[in-house]
Regions:
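Intrinsic disorder/low-complexity detector
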Residues: 1-17, 47-98, 127-158
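The feature marks the first
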Residues: 2-38
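Short beta-strand-centered segments at strand-helix junctions
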Residues: 22-37, 94-111
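Short, charged beta-turn/beta-strand-edge "cap" motif at the junction between a beta-strand
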Residues: 32-33, 50-53, 106, 124-127
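DNA polymerase processivity clamps
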Residues: 40-48, 114-122
Length: 158
């Protein structure tokens, strides 16, 4: 998996860029699916990343139930509806042919829209982060990580 800053300890490992298509689906990069053990028909949890920022974390439901997320995930009753806990959005959805279908409600909750380009990175051992590329560019530029910004343009799009 490419690092945004090869040779720099702690640099984010990127899986690629996922695009939210006009019919509201996005693909999970294949290497991310392998790394996190995501299979066809898995139920996954989408959760707000940083409050007030676009994007979300994606966690397999079975994995989330073994973590601190369990207390929230246990309360979610339906698929593809947004549930709010502690001002963070949570939703369940499923993987179909390596893709995740979103709804207008989910897009609104995660401050996204069709055409959004999401950088898929290793967030934690259980979570893949999908954050708008523009947010990453702003944060990296603020810290002078221009090589990482340049490397983002070399990532595969899905």
């Amino acid at each position: 998996m490419p690092s945004l800053q090869p040779g720099m300890p702690g640099a984010k490992e990127a899986y690629g860029i996922s695009i939210i298509h006009d019919d509201l689906w996005f693909a999970i990069p294949p290497k991310a699916k392998v790394r996190y053990g995501i299979q066809e028909d898995d139920i996954v949890v989408l959760v707000t990343g940083h409050r007030g920022e676009g994007g979300f974390g994606l966690i397999k439901k079975d994995t989330a139930l073994k973590t601190v997320f369990a207390r929230f995930v246990d309360k979610i009753e339906g698929i593809e509806h947004v549930y709010w806990y502690d001002r963070k959005a949570y939703a369940l959805t499923h993987v179909d042919n390596g893709k995740v279908q979103l709804t207008p409600e989910l897009l609104q909750a995660f401050y996204l829209e069709p055409g959004s380009h999401l950088l898929a990175v290793k967030s934690t051992t259980v979570t893949i982060s999908f954050t708008p590329v523009e947010i990453w560019k702003q944060k990296l530029a603020k810290h002078g990580f221009f090589e990482a910004i340049e490397n983002m343009s070399k990532l595969e799009e899905f």
